[in-house]
């Protein structure tokens, strides 16, 4: 499975070293160790390969980040670190700010940042509605339906900035777009560059 992950990284144009792969393995073992205690992933996903698939799903967003080249990325609702920690492991060229309201998950994220030596990671414990800073690039993977949060996210998005939402089926995205299209200057849907059994699309919201 690790070989498949490395091949996928190459196909995505993501650089990696033996050190970054070792960090990924260490992180996955930590998720498995603390998963139940901190409610990091579902019980069905408390397996190495299952967590690795979450990591792969996280990293497929990297080409979009690379194309836009933001100085800093805000990951809203980071949870166990998907996609924020994973992106930070394989991309040390920019800063990743992980926003999470759960104290348990914040504790885990800060522990991972320290243990992995991720100097490009900053963890904030607060709800997105309480965030005051503005960001040029925002990622969200935790929200099933973006309609409830679109107006809040727009407030913390800089002019000309981009929200990249990890989404599923195309038809469900179209339904969500119909309710939020007036909030953004441009909206795009981009397919995942990695084919998998689970349909993955990216909803791109430009301010």
UniProtKB/Swiss-Prot annotation:
Its EC number is 2.1.1.-. S-adenosyl-L-methionine binds at residues 77, 82, 100-102, 141. It holds the Pfam family GidB. GO terms for molecular function: rRNA (guanine-N7-)-methyltransferase activity. It comes from the Bacteria. One of its GO terms (cellular component) is cytosol. The keyword Plastid does not apply. Its main location: cytoplasm. CDD domains: AdoMet_MTases. InterPro entries: rRNA_ssu_MeTfrase_G (IPR003682), SAM-dependent_MTases_sf (IPR029063). Keywords: Cytoplasm, Methyltransferase, rRNA processing, S-adenosyl-L-methionine, Transferase. It is found in: Cytoplasm. Specifically methylates the N7 position of a guanine in 16S rRNA. Belongs to the methyltransferase superfamily. RNA methyltransferase RsmG family. This is Ribosomal RNA small subunit methyltransferase G. It comes from Borrelia hermsii (strain HS1 / DAH). The lineage of its organism: Bacteria, Pseudomonadati, Spirochaetota, Spirochaetia, Spirochaetales. The gene is rsmG.
